[in-house]
Amino acid sequence: KKVLETATIPATGSSHTNSYGVYVGMTYTAGNLIYQITSIDTATVGQSKVIGVVAAKKNKIKKVTITDRADCKGYRLNVTTIGNNAFAGCKALEKLTIGNKVTVIGKNAFKNCSKLETVVIGKAVKTISSKAFIGDNKIKKITFKGDKLKTVKKNAFSKKAKKNIKSKKTKLKGNKKAIKLFKKKLKIK
């Protein structure tokens, strides 16, 4: 397994191995995705972030569903963050579904996923970081499942992608409050 990013470990949580044999900073693979544990909140629940895709699948994976939870050694971990550069350069990726516990989409998270067409943003997403979808000019549909969205960096999408949204080549669906804020942050009328 290759760690694609160094995590910032929160002050909360345990820094030692718990009874499940998991610890903050530990990386693990579930399916085609690589995760890193960011906190251990209780005896049975913690948090993790997606930090990448298994190297052998990076240029082959067409569909990614980031689930609400990814278990490691029987320990339940809520997936709350998509790490910086996690899926950058996944050239075959066409469809992305972000789970309902994810709150942050990191910098460059889906940069240069040149075939990406469909994005479903989960209920809890609050932040879409800088260049999160830069270079993804073929997006045809973005669906917002919730109304928690607060921050969309103005350079989260490329100029071409913004132009497609403005001209309605890219359809925006779902929660009206999230769509309104999304368009406002990207300065799209």
Region locations from a protein language model:
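Conserved "repeat-terminator" motif of extracellular CCP/Sushi domains
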Residues: 1, 20-21
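Structural signature of tandem-repeat unit edges
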Residues: 1-12, 32, 39-44, 58-81, ...
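Glycine/tyrosine- and acidic-biased, solvent-exposed loop/turn segments at the edges of beta-strands
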Residues: 19-20, 30, 88-92, 111-112, ...
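Consensus positions within tandem repeat domains that build extended binding/scaffold surfaces
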Residues: 83-86, 106-109, 129-132, 155-156
